[in-house]
A protein has these predicted regions:
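Unchanged
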Residues: 40-64, 73-129
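Short, flexible active-site-adjacent loop segments at beta-strand->alpha-helix junctions, enriched
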Residues: 16, 24-25, 72, 95
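Conserved Nudix-box catalytic region and its N-terminal flanking loop in Nudix hydrolases
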Residues: 17-56
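Charged phosphate-binding loop/patch that engages nucleotide di/tri-phosphates or the phosphate backbone
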Residues: 126-141
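Conserved N-terminal beta-strand and adjoining loop/helix that marks the start
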Residues: 1-19, 36-39, 85
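A generic fold-level signal
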Residues: 3-5, 13, 27-28, 81-84, ...
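Conserved hydrophobic "DFG−1" position in protein kinase catalytic cores
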Residues: 12-13, 20, 91, 115
Length: 141
């Protein structure tokens, strides 16, 4: 059995919307919308990983309390083996964070970012684990 790759991601919730970023066409998950985040380094704590990844991707330092709200499992194409596990954190804020993709270290991983409410989440698969988790969080209020 292969080692499962670990990731961290953050749902940035502002009012009744969440921040999502669209992946570029050449990286992993090309053209898909997702939460900011990425791969953890060896022995890196998930909280440290999301703080690092968020800064690298958005040029913004997370300064609010983060809360672990769930996990998203990723499987190989036939669904027989888990290949990745994402620790998903939630950060609630009253002020929109506007990612600075142009000046971010890894800003080229995304082509755009935006805020979406529960009715307009840009996921092709509404049954995707991440989409369901975001929907549950947005409908809590």
């Amino acid at each position: 059995m292969k080692e499962v790759k670990r990731y961290s991601g953050v749902i940035v919730k502002c009012g009744d919307e969440v921040l999502l970023c669209k992946r570029n066409a050449t990286g992993s998950l090309p053209g898909q919308w997702s939460i900011p985040g990425g791969s953890l380094e060896k022995d890196e704590h998930p909280m440290d990983g999301i703080e690092r990844e968020f800064k690298e991707e958005t040029n913004y330092t997370l300064d609010n309390d983060l809360k672990l709200v769930g996990f998203v499992k990723r499987y190989n194409r036939d669904g027989s083996e888990m290949k990745g596990l994402m620790y998903v954190f939630l950060m609630e804020t009253d002020k929109r964070i506007n990612p600075d993709l142009e000046n971010a270290f890894d800003g080229d991983e995304h082509t755009e970012c935006g805020y979406f409410d529960v009715e307009n989440l840009p996921f092709d698969d509404k049954d995707d684990q991440l989409c369901r988790l975001i929907t549950r969080i947005l409908k809590k209020d």
